[in-house]
């Protein structure tokens, strides 16, 4: 048959084998997919898959829990579909691939929702009860959407960080790391959000541009004798006029808390004589800064930063209020730069990490640190001049007072990247507060008399033992761990797991039986949830000591919640499903894979690594996979304000979840994932091509029974053996990609296979044999044998990403056979072995190149009007060498490969030549097969049939060997 498209023929006295299938051409995905979801739920498909893999090696993809707040967005869909594809691909490879979905349930966003719905000031217990109910409802909504995407997992038994057992085990994990010596309490600057009223984790901070007042402030000379010595000048010369050391800052609100100044020990500093007085600036900044100050000046002396160490200066507000009558010493700091500003940094230890470290290193006690900013961002009422003002409102007033003091040299608006709360989108600050920390560089308790590496050392070593997909994630996580500060474990919140400590009222010391008491609290939490801590009377546990202690009111960082799920879930609540003793014995890393967005290098990947390093001394995972963020077709970040967000629910309802899955699978997740209406239209077209190929395969297998019609590969036609060999080669590539968590190459190769290898060649050639040879002929059954094997292999390749379609096709393909009732309990298909497969592949590759040249020449003749269909043509090919031999080996079957009515081969003048001559056939057209043949009408009883069709219908049937 030709490649012409024909309407379904009316009944003919010369019928062809045109079969139909119950697999429809139109996917009608929005309607059919929910039916599949319900069917999978009803038959408990995930349980059936687990039962089918019982005893097999486990593969654990541990779910990074989404937050139980709001509807899922396209980023959630990407994440869950990627996980689902991996779990299904591993399951089809024969592994017991386990997927327990989870949810992150505690934290500020839910507290905010409760506050919005019920107002502020609720008792803690009431907040917790309402938060638990709210999270439960959100989880139900999100679960429906995740299942709608075709994601299989233990949806009936997900893990929730708010489950009582998980909350209790989290407390036990805290107890363990305390016993190991990682946890301490201290005053440190931490990320602080005024709107949250709490410390923030590093992962809860984002950076946005902010406009601030940039100021250059002079600290008046106080110890001129020491300055004179440093600059090798006389005291009289320095006392002749006023002088200042000048700092530059973009946080005027920190000036009232200044306690020191920092210079770089190796930088050269200049004493500059100006009409206003002496200024001390970094030498390389003098020219630029004088321009800014609109001053002329001359350098009269220079010295090194080291020579200025410990020299003190007056606070710039000292003249305005005696409350600032203090001196600020110079401390040396390697972090001081001369890229911008004056080369001198003002230090407010309560509001800067480096400031704090520098001042502490020089002997400043916690008690001495000045910290007037309260948790709501307002200065304490006792602060001179600015008490009661918010720090942002105080900025312009501070500038006014500095100007009045005569110590302001410049002020202007300055745009810079600044820290913001990821929830409230409001600016945050560093603020020194008393918090509980996990120390990155503290020395843990010795084990068996041996020193234990620090947390930082253990975590960095763990990174080296972890596989990263893509590989750049390794360096990214390494840099974050190498440079991070101590982990602030405590939060000042209500809806969170309590740091259930008893603290001495006078000394602040922990109760000496803290580890034992934590276990007692954990048992109560296991029965009643974190609410048990709120209702607990200290006397119940402390007896007569109760009056000496108070309950700690801090909660654990929510990143500790999700970061300990390797302990609370894999080794805890879902141990029966997820725990693998052999993996524990091997190296203790129980999760084969953690998979999340690239932001989780500073989030879940990070916190999980730190907690596992403290608990076990190794990472909880063997591999980390990172995917990019979704952007629109122009590469812009998804934003409601821009109006470019895409709803997975809308796509599923309009196009089908299968389109989302195919889009995810076909996109390189290692970078940004672009999505738009235009991109989705292309995905739909791609889906249709794959579906049409499947429909053709299933249609032509509708009268095939493998138990009756199977033939050994040696009895197939040569082109059938080639097609199966090609399928086998592709399958090896597909499975290799799946092993490496690569999906877009699989989709690309499947599309090429469908459009070029099958639709553009093999199936195109096969149509004549399938349609025109006798229904039960060996030639036709051989073709169906090949299609049977190709279809079964292809359905398994598709199943991880086109899950609904593969399952739908499987029901048609496997109906009434001994196959499993779902494709997901089967495994990748083992294709029959084809003898001399490599030789066949090479030979047919050459033949396809010849066919491409013939098609090109046929098209040229068609354009000229000499022929219509390619079957109106007869072709002569002149070739040499192996190509000539390959063409000649096909004998009369060559015309079927070329889709022409006749084909002859002759030697070319030169061995490497390939010459194609096309002529229009002068013969009559067979009514049935449409070939133009000399023997049409040779049987007067059937004057419109060629001899081949006459034989196939009424005689012994034609014989074919090759195609």
Curated annotation (Swiss-Prot):
Residues the record lists as binding Zn(2+): 926, 929, 946, 949
Motif 'HIGH' region: where in chain: 66-76
A Gene Ontology biological process term: isoleucyl-tRNA aminoacylation
GO cellular component: cytosol
Pfam families (alphabetical): Anticodon_1, tRNA-synt_1, zf-FPG_IleRS
Cofactor dependency: Zn(2+)
Residue ranges annotated as motif 'KMSKS' region: 637-641
SUPFAM superfamilies attached to this UniProt entry: Anticodon-binding domain of a subclass of class I aminoacyl-tRNA synthetases (SSF47323), Nucleotidylyl transferase (SSF52374), ValRS/IleRS/LeuRS editing domain (SSF50677)
One MF term in the entry's GO annotations: tRNA binding
Main EC class the enzyme belongs to: ligase
Amino-acid positions noted as binding L-isoleucyl-5'-AMP in the UniProt annotation, renumbered to this chain: 596
InterPro entries: aa-tRNA-synth_I_CS, aa-tRNA-synth_Ia, Anticodon_Ile_BEm, Ile-tRNA-ligase, Ile-tRNA-ligase_type1, Ile-tRNA_ligase, M/V/L/I-tRNA-synth_anticd-bd, Rossmann-like_a/b/a_fold
Cofactor binding annotation: Binds 1 zinc ion per subunit.
Compartments where located: Cytoplasm
Binding annotation for ATP: 640
PROSITE patterns attached to this UniProt entry: AA_TRNA_LIGASE_I (PS00178)
Keywords, alphabetical: Aminoacyl-tRNA synthetase, ATP-binding, Cytoplasm, Ligase, Metal-binding, Nucleotide-binding, Protein biosynthesis, Zinc
Substrates-to-products reaction catalysed: tRNA(Ile) + L-isoleucine + ATP = L-isoleucyl-tRNA(Ile) + AMP + diphosphate
Function: Catalyzes the attachment of isoleucine to tRNA(Ile). As IleRS can inadvertently accommodate and process structurally similar amino acids such as valine, to avoid such errors it has two additional distinct tRNA(Ile)-dependent editing activities. One activity is designated as 'pretransfer' editing and involves the hydrolysis of activated Val-AMP. The other activity is designated 'posttransfer' editing and involves deacylation of mischarged Val-tRNA(Ile).
Entry's free-text remark on domains: IleRS has two distinct active sites: one for aminoacylation and one for editing. The misactivated valine is translocated from the active site to the editing site, which sterically excludes the correctly activated isoleucine. The single editing site contains two valyl binding pockets, one specific for each substrate (Val-AMP or Val-tRNA(Ile)).
Oligomer status and interactors: Monomer.
PANTHER family linked to this entry: ISOLEUCINE--TRNA LIGASE, MITOCHONDRIAL (PTHR42765:SF1), SOLEUCYL-TRNA SYNTHETASE (PTHR42765)
NCBIfam families, sorted: ileS
Family, as annotated: Belongs to the class-I aminoacyl-tRNA synthetase family. IleS type 1 subfamily.
Protein's recorded name: Isoleucine--tRNA ligase
Organism the protein comes from: Cupriavidus pinatubonensis (strain JMP 134 / LMG 1197)
This protein's encoding gene: ileS
